[in-house]
Amino acid sequence: AGINDWGGVSPLTPDHVNPEAPWPHLDKLSKDTEKAGKTLAERLTIYPDYIREGDWVDSKFITPILELVDAEYLPKMDSWTPGEIVEPPLSVLQQIRDRASPLNQNIKDIFEKVDEGQLLNEHEVVSLFEARGSNFSAVCDKANELRKTVNGEEVSFVINRNINYTNVCYFKCQFCAFSKGKLSENLRGKPYDLEHDEIGRRVAEAWQRGATEVCMQGGIHPQYTGQTYIDIVKTVKDEVPEMHVHAFSPLEIWQGAETLGITLEEFLQDLKKAGLDTLPGTAAEVLDDEVRAVICPDKINTSQWLSVMRAAHQVGFSTTATIMYGHVEQPVNWARHLIRVRDLQIE
């Protein structure tokens, strides 16, 4: 009939509405709810939709409330948050390791679709992200099973050095270590812009210590042009011709081409001739303009990010893709991000 909330259920207070027939123990209620294809999840006294909209909540309470909830605006069951250097709680890690079968028919149907090699739609990907309890364990187990099929059990690594050539940036996103200004100087240090000789020295030092790759990115310096990025690549190859250069996000590629007045393909060809080997898929944040309008409104949009990567593939580059989660986004935004990356791979 559409019910999605058990009214009056509380582990803290008795059932004052119907004291003669109190609510069953939460464990039993949880199991009965799960058998019906639903998941029992605690909520705050504020419904998730009201937290999501934000305008309903007084501004001084928004941050404290958001610190209490997960991406679905339901209460977190532990104090762990994304971005911390500690591992998630053991209870979560155990759920990931458990080999459970999904109880939710919708999850079962999605698994069947995956086994048949069909592409999942946005709603189905969101359903996987929103899985809880044994359904969550089943999704993790299924993902691990697919990983084994696609990649096997061998794990490789590369000895790499990150070289950030500048932390000066004219974009205004506040989450980035390259964002400089009065509000960030005490947290991120003084502005710097490495000379090419210093970049070369760091490349040589990395090679001497066993590195075979350098990853180079930085802020979008107002004085940088596309030629700056070309010269940085040449600096690396002049110092150590064998060094693999993994550098420049789609944002830097977009800005570089724009400053030189050439197409993305032409600029990427110039970088390739200079010695660029692969491109990192950073500056993606979340590939959904609904989120980007909040966290990075002045950066390239989703379509522009994808167009850079599409051009890179056409030129012959291999690329990666990143996602930055744990801020204002929701599972639907993760789903859109992954689907857009998947569709670009298929192209």
Predicted regions and their residues:
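Auxiliary Fe-S-binding modules of radical SAM enzymes
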Residues: 1-134, 148-150, 201, 207, ...
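Active-site loop-helix segments enriched in His/Asp/Glu that coordinate
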Residues: 186-200, 221-238
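N-terminal pre-triad scaffold of radical SAM enzymes
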Residues: 138-183, 191-217
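Radical SAM/AdoMet-radical enzyme domain recognition
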Residues: 173, 212-213, 226, 230-323
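Glycine-rich, proline-tolerant flexible connector loops at the mouths of alpha/beta enzymes
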Residues: 13-19, 161, 180-183, 187, ...
